[in-house]
From Swiss-Prot:
It is found in: Cell membrane. The chain crosses the membrane at residues 26-49, 58-79, 101-120, 140-158, 196-219, 237-259, 273-292. It comes from Gorilla gorilla gorilla (Western lowland gorilla). Disulfide bonds join 97-189. This is Olfactory receptor 1E2. The gene is OR1E2.
Length: 314
């Protein structure tokens, strides 16, 4: 009987964003512009790091993977949202919904681990500059990236398999713009306690601990910089750390609020807005905060442009 109930749901209906019909076109144009900005910004970073040998360093290895993760993270949800806004067809097949959830978790978790690796890289570079090359060896950097991919793959698969075992009966309306894990659990008509416990326990390992490690790394960085009597260096460091921490806090804060500390009286509108912060806004901001405004990336862009104009220039 349970298997029959589960297979009775062949698709889900995504309600999308709670916007008025007269605002549909404006919102579509806005989200399309944000998505294209995310794609172009992150693709530019990946291409520049690939083409410029000056950027073949640990920090830019992490940045290129972060850009790829951001690009994919947005592509998991935004194209479907834009499609639904255009053709007014909110349905998504059951298998596609679980697939979307899997890749959403995969690239979201991957970003979490990569942000930790980048914070550690900056911590070593600023606090132990003389030992940076020895500590951040190519083997360690590749191992950190590979470990991030492996852990996130298994974590996303765990949640997807746990979700696939649940039964979904009559209600197939998801009050969200993508197949969110918490929204799907609310629709299940079977026991979800195992899923909820796994979310809470694994969430602490995947989200809370990385967030605390990042805060600790930047705290040590600030402490180290304050010991140097240079007002210009202090201002620059606080500007950089402040911008990084603002994006990190936006990403982790919304995820912790939604999945680990959900409010009993939280509205669908509030949850949707919070989800937009880390699915749309953060991937769009990351290229500008971490890469495109720094001197190395600007220099790489100039060198690539010069080579295009003069192919014989070394």
């Amino acid at each position: 009987m349970m298997g029959q109930n589960q297979t009775s749901i062949s698709d889900f209906l995504l309600l999308g964003l709670p916007i008025q019909p007269e605002q549909q076109n404006l919102c579509y144009a806005l989200f399309l512009a944000m998505y294209l900005t995310t794609l172009l910004g992150n693709l530019l970073i990946i291409v520049l790091i690939r083409l410029d040998s000056h950027l073949h360093t640990p920090m830019y290895l992490f940045l290129s993977n972060l850009s790829f993760s951001d690009l994919c993270f947005s592509s998991v949800t935004i194209p479907k949202l834009l499609q639904n806004m255009q053709n007014q067809d909110p349905s998504i097949p059951y298998a596609d919904c679980l697939t979307q959830m899997y890749f959403f978790l995969l690239f979201g978790d991957l970003e979490s681990f990569l942000l930790v690796a980048m914070a550690y890289d900056r911590y070593v570079a600023i606090c132990f500059p003389l030992h940076y090359t020895a500590i951040m060896s190519p083997m360690l950097c590749l191992s950190l990236v590979a470990l991030s991919w492996v852990l996130t793959t298994f974590h996303a698969m765990l949640h997807t398999l746990l979700m696939a075992r649940l039964c979904f009966c009559a209600d197939n309306v998801i009050p969200h713009f993508f197949c969110d894990m918490s929204a799907l659990l609310k629709l299940a008509c079977s026991d979800t306690r195992v899923n909820e416990w796994v979310i809470f326990i694994m969430g602490g390992l995947i989200v809370v601990i990385p967030f605390l490690l990042i805060l600790g790394s930047y705290a040590r960085i600030v402490s180290s910089i304050l010991k140097v009597p240079s007002s210009k260096g202090i201002c620059k460091a606080f500007s950089t750390c402040g911008s990084h921490l603002s994006v990190v806090s936006l990403f982790y804060g919304t995820i912790i609020g939604l999945y680990l500390c959900p409010s009993a009286n939280s509205s669908t509108l509030k949850e949707t807005v919070m989800a937009m912060m880390y699915t749309v806004v953060t991937p769009m901001l990351n290229p500008f905060i971490y890469s495109l405004r720094n001197r190395d990336m600007k220099g790489a862009l100039e060198r690539v442009i010069c080579k295009r104009k003069n192919p014989f220039l070394l």
